[in-house]
Amino acid sequence: MTRLRKVIATLAALTAAVATTAACTGSGGDTNDTIGAPTPAADRTPLSLTVRPKAHATGLPVSTEIGATVAGGSVDSVRLVDAHGDRVDGSLRADGTSWVPDRPLAYHRRYTATVVAVGARRQHIERSTTFTTMSEPGNRVGTGMYVQDGRTYGVGMPIAVEILRDVPKNLRASVQRRLFVRSDPPQPGAWHWFSPQRVEYRPATWWQPGTKLTVRMALGGLPLGHGGYGDTDRTATARIATDRVELRITNRPKQLKVYQNGKLTRTMPVSLGKADAPSSSGHMVIMDKAAHTVFDTRGIPGENYVAPVDNAQRLTWGGEFIHAAPWSVADQGHRNVSHGCVNISDPDAAWLFARTHIGDPVTVSGTGTRLATGNGWTDWDMDWATFVAGSALPVPDSVRHAKAYQPYPKR
């Protein structure tokens, strides 16, 4: 109904966490402390071990990881304790290059890391390093993610991370390495930087219904450029709905069709955006839901009204919603009279609101106006090759070439 510039509700509040590129089984720090047996080639290589950080290093970020370089074997265990002897839990990255603490380290505190490596003949070698973290910085950068612990989302739900300051290009890889996603069952996925402040993760295809998602945005204390450091870590465990709900909206005919698990369950007449405020065509997801809200366009050029609205479901940052519009019932199915929103009747809006989830896929077609990239969660509005090209880290071939599809219909 209107192109609002502000969010109508707390949009799936900034909470939670996220993933590295190879997150199909759980990227980054989701493995156990013990790695598998050494390769046969290690039989002929003398066992050696180098650990990081450098001994007696000071002023390190609280996002510091314990690095290990092993020849002739593999890492067997990592132990990290502070000056009081309190142990810090953590886990090895899948590639074994470093050990990631489960939480940010404390500021201005001394730590000792002990790494044990094992060789092909089960011989062991141990190395330790002691380091001190930096003092608490005065320049904290706000961060957040649109996933909440304990919530259930639709099959198209991306994991969207926001950083409230531009991240320089040379630091985006280090940011992405601190974003972790694990899906159960495992599904290949990747990250895409939509802007210097926003990076989002999606699987190659829609999430399997019933998937469990475990996410961590480990940006607490991470250097983000210009003297700023991430404010905190965020974690969440969420579920994907067991039913796959999909909305398909067309301009000709002016209809909204609801599909549940691929079966058409309801068809509704709609009125879309009028000629000077057309609705966007593209692949979107429901971003937020509000049973009762107020659209206030005062201060927006060409608009000047305040209207209470029921059963509103946000599709774009620019202010396109699906919502009840009893004032346009006579036009629904016949004429486009809205300010860009999808107008439906009160009964249809209530029925739909009760059955949808944040993250359900929505396709709008035939309006003549293309959805702008980044105007909402537009992860599904590009093909897979384009999406993975937006990663700041190399994407494994198994993920890059994963079976993917463009949701119905192609534009």
Where are these regions (language model features)?
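Acidic, low-complexity Ser/Thr/Gly/Pro-rich repeat segments typical of extracellular/periplasmic
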Residues: 2-21, 25-243, 398-405, 410
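Short, solvent-exposed loop/turn elements at domain surfaces
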Residues: 77-79, 170-172, 256-258, 293-297, ...
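Short, charged beta-turn/beta-strand-edge "cap" motif at the junction between a beta-strand
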Residues: 117-119, 219-221, 262, 292, ...
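Exported/periplasmic cell-wall-interacting domains
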Residues: 155, 244, 281, 290, ...
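Solvent-exposed, polar/charged alpha-helical surfaces in well-ordered, non-transmembrane soluble domains
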Residues: 157, 161, 165, 205, ...
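Short beta-strands and strand-coil junctions in structured, solvent-facing domains, enriched
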Residues: 168-170, 222-225, 255, 292-294, ...
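A structural motif detector for short, solvent-exposed N-terminal "entry" segments of globular domains
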Residues: 234-274
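Conserved hydrophobic/aromatic pocket- or pore-lining residues that grip, position, or stack substrates
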Residues: 256, 286, 313
